[in-house]
Amino acid sequence: PQTVRGVIARSKGAPVELTDIVIPDPGPSEVTALIATCAVCHTDLTYREGGINDEFPFLLGHEAAGTVESVGEGVDSVQPGDYVVLNWRAVCGQCRACKRGRPQYCFSTFNATQKMTLTDGTELTPALGIGAFADKTLVHAGQCTKVDPAADPAVAGLLGCGVMAGLGAAVNTGAVSRGDSVAVIGCGAVGDAVIAGARLAGANKIIAVDRDAKKLEWATELGATHTVNATETDVVEAVQALTGGFGADVVIDAVGRPETWKQAFYARDLAGTVVLVGVPTPDMRLEMPLLDFFSRGGALKSSWYGDCLPERDFPVLIDLHLQGRLPLDKFVTERISLDDVEKAFHTMHAGEVLRSVVVW
């Protein structure tokens, strides 16, 4: 076992702490990863607030890149020294979804078997089975996806969660294709990743919708061709006006509230596609005329982790970034140290950054 530093959430809503944690030596199918970078994602804040479950204390952090330090028995997919992005979809290959050729819906994904602990032996729950706000972490070998080591780890690690969620919502779930018109509601990091994905897929018109002028600026930098400030205009009318009165082919809700989903529903073209990627809270309800669903046709989808397969998608997206076709570096607003995580939660909540990235 090794003792390293890690950022933990000890109790609901309490500020996070930087403390010593114990990492076991990797057992069968497990890997110890040396963390190079880990971005601050809203999901970490949700863990701290008790919004995922109440299995405190949590070892936070999951959007990470680094190198494999050591491997356990039976691991042949990676070896010490490999440059990897960590993922939380290590598919099992055996469940119903995997066997039907839909591994992105795998419901038996792998995590490390052994528990990381505090120095007093208290077991930690790693965020999304990763726990990467730490000098090192213990994961399942399938959670390590090899990518080109030429990529800056601060950039590569973003694919571990939010940026992949957005890119995949456009490219995989929404199936945006050349010449499409796309509207994106909510232009934080996930929404901007949707925009980058739509641009990559060849969308002709990309309409960014937000209430914050600064976020609309970021959206333009990432490829939006038009912007709509939702505080100043009716979103549905604005999207229709920008698409010849028809509505967009694909509308992606990166907020996840009843009112934004309704905007997405009515802002799409007849038989268009709506993709929900923003995460609603359990108490949110939607009331709409059922006839509107019947009469408009099309597809209503949700996207979880961008319907990605890490081993298929991460290397390709990193290659596209290195070719200059996917500006992942624009998501990195600031680079911070491990003891700045609590402060970064406040900066993120205030909408002042796309991503704060902890760099070792």
Curated annotation (Swiss-Prot):
Signal peptide: none annotated. One of its GO terms (molecular function) is S-(hydroxymethyl)glutathione dehydrogenase [NAD(P)+] activity. It catalyses: S-(hydroxymethyl)mycothiol + NAD(+) = S-formylmycothiol + NADH + H(+). Its cofactor is Zn(2+). Homotrimer. NCBIfam families: mycoS_dep_FDH. This is S-(hydroxymethyl)mycothiol dehydrogenase. PROSITE patterns: ADH_ZINC. Binds 2 Zn(2+) ions per subunit. Keywords: Metal-binding, NAD, Oxidoreductase, Zinc. It comes from the Bacteria. CDD domains: Zn_ADH_class_III. GO terms for biological process: formaldehyde catabolic process. The keyword Nucleus does not apply. GO terms for cellular component: cytosol. Zn(2+) 2 binds at C92, C95, C98, C106. InterPro entries: ADH-like_C (IPR013149), ADH-like_N (IPR013154), ADH_Zn_CS (IPR002328), GroES-like_sf (IPR011032), MycoS_dep_FDH (IPR017816), NAD(P)-bd_dom_sf (IPR036291). Belongs to the zinc-containing alcohol dehydrogenase family. Zn(2+) 1 binds at C41, H62, C161. The keyword Disulfide bond does not apply. Its EC number is 1.1.1.306.
